[in-house]
Amino acid sequence: LNYYGPLPNCDLLRRYGYTSAKHSRYDVVEVPWDIIASTIDKRYTGKKGVLDEEEMEEGFVLERDSGEPDDTGINTHPAKFVAFPEELEEQVCQVIGPAMSVDMNRGPNKAQRKQLKLAYYEIMDAVIPARLAQYGTTVEQDEQLLKNPDLEGRHRMAVFVRLGEKKLLKEAKEFIPAQLEKYKPAQEEEEGRSAKRQKR
């Protein structure tokens, strides 16, 4: 890394007019709340929680866990996407809780927490493709563009930044299946629910 420190490529380009493959590990991407809210509205038609406009976040930044550099300033920690922002989960659950009959003022019980987690990751599983769809190109198209020797200067760097954002979104998408598996109801719970429904 240079003396500018661990900056994502979008900041490097904006501040200093260049990009670097070494900084790709620090890349970030913003997910606007309106995409998330739209996804929630499609899935939940019941009464949803209302957010305080002054406290709600209008967008959330996704980033990798990049670790800290060692004493020599070199970072050998593998950069990896390991979590969505906590504030994002809180805001989503605040909205979907009432639609799932969860009293968010009292707080969810253990079973409800699990249900909320599952619903949250199902929402994010739909949000990421929606965010990717906002770009005019795919990862593969950007990679092809960067192979073109005629693509120069700031245009090339802008494509490089855009590609870095998409790669991070794809990593976030790949992180989700394990979370869905972790929070999905056990088979016995499902069978118990279906037995209760049949009794009714």
Predicted features by range, described:
Residues 1-11:
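Short, charged beta-turn/beta-strand-edge "cap" motif at the junction between a beta-strand
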Residues 9-11, 15-200:
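Charged low-complexity "KEKE/polyampholyte" interaction tracts
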